[in-house]
Design a protein with these regions (language model features):
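N-terminal amphipathic/basic leader segments beginning at the initiator methionine
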Residues: 1-18
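Mg2+-dependent prenyl diphosphate-binding active-site environment of isoprenoid biosynthetic enzymes
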Residues: 9, 18, 22-268, 276-286
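Short cytosolic juxtamembrane segments of multi-pass membrane proteins
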Residues: 289-290
């Protein structure tokens, strides 16, 4: 199981989905496709595929819901970059959506990607049955007001505060970043009809991986460079945002990231099945430069 090959399969599935003739709403789909195809690591769909692959080898069967996960993630990035949110003009090394298409179309493109993803998941559930429906609920919950959007709200209302509690910071990042990561992993296991015990273990794994991912993001915002990251750096500092660096410091965050990643590997080692590809990706996320 090659991670780069999986990324290519996800990329091709997304390109094929948006490579259709449109009429009066063509600019909407152009805007959606722009942000989808501009690049990205495809971590969330790959996590879903690798979680499924622990139990079953026919991972191509779930490329459709994996594609939907990436649409949800991309919609959140389009909205995050808007002037009323993070006001970013660079994403994945390219101008952000609203810089190319304007704010109004960018808002609608984000809305459309979320709705398109839910349509895909519902259609898939109607075809595949109860396991697909359970996976769809996990994903919908993760994207909603008690998930990713809830974390974004806490981020917004805490801008310019001198400090926030660790509990509130954990909530913000585990919802805004971690929830969709965890849902990708859990939904893959559910689609593979894993045992309840394993799903619980993978939920814990997803929680920890999401935390390590966010801490690593905070580290890269300090020590990374815009060329590698494909986006502007030092944004949190410039926007007076609290993060794990402001609470623990850079060196302690580096240690935490390593320790949490080791805990992730331990959880995977306790699961019977082919967890090696997921372990490889977990370590790559720790070592990433972007």
């Amino acid at each position: 199981m090659n991670i780069n090959s999986l990324k290519e399969e996800v990329d091709q599935s997304l390109k094929a989905y948006f490579n259709k003739d449109r009429e009066y709403n063509k600019v909407l789909y152009d805007s959606m496709a722009y942000s989808i195809n501009v690049g990205g690591k495809r971590i969330r769909p790959i996590l879903m595929l690798l979680s499924y692959y622990i139990y079953k080898s026919d991972y191509k069967k779930i490329l459709t819901p994996a594609m939907a996960i990436e649409m949800i993630h991309t919609y959140s990035l389009i909205h995050d970059d808007l002037p009323c949110m993070d006001n970013d003009d660079l994403r994945r090394g390219k101008p952000t959506n609203h810089k190319v298409f304007g704010e109004a179309i960018a808002v609608l493109a984000g809305d459309a990607l979320l709705n398109e993803a839910m349509k895909i998941l519902v259609d898939y559930s109607l075809e595949e049955g109860i396991s697909a429906l359970k996976a769809t609920k996990i994903i919908a919950d993760a994207a909603g007001s008690d998930g990713m959007i809830g974390g974004q709200i806490v981020d917004i209302i805490n801008e310019d505060k001198e400090e926030i509690s660790l509990k509130e910071l954990d909530y913000m990042h585990l919802k805004k970043t971690g929830e969709l990561i965890k849902a990708s992993i859990m939904s893959g296991a559910v689609l593979a009809e894993a045992s309840e015990g394993d799903i619980k273990k993978l939920e814990d794994f997803g929680y920890k991986l999401g935390l390590a991912f966010q801490i690593k993001d905070d580290i890269l915002d300090v020590v990374g460079n815009a060329k590698d990251l494909g986006k502007n750096v030092h944004k949190d500092q410039e926007s007076n945002k609290n993060n794990y660096i402001t609470i623990f410091g850079l060196e302690e965050c580096k240690k935490k990231c390593v320790n949490i990643t080791e805990e992730c590997i331990e959880i995977l080692s306790s699961i019977k099945g082919n967890t090696e590809p997921l372990k490889v990706l977990t370590m790559k996320l720790l070592e990433r430069k972007f």
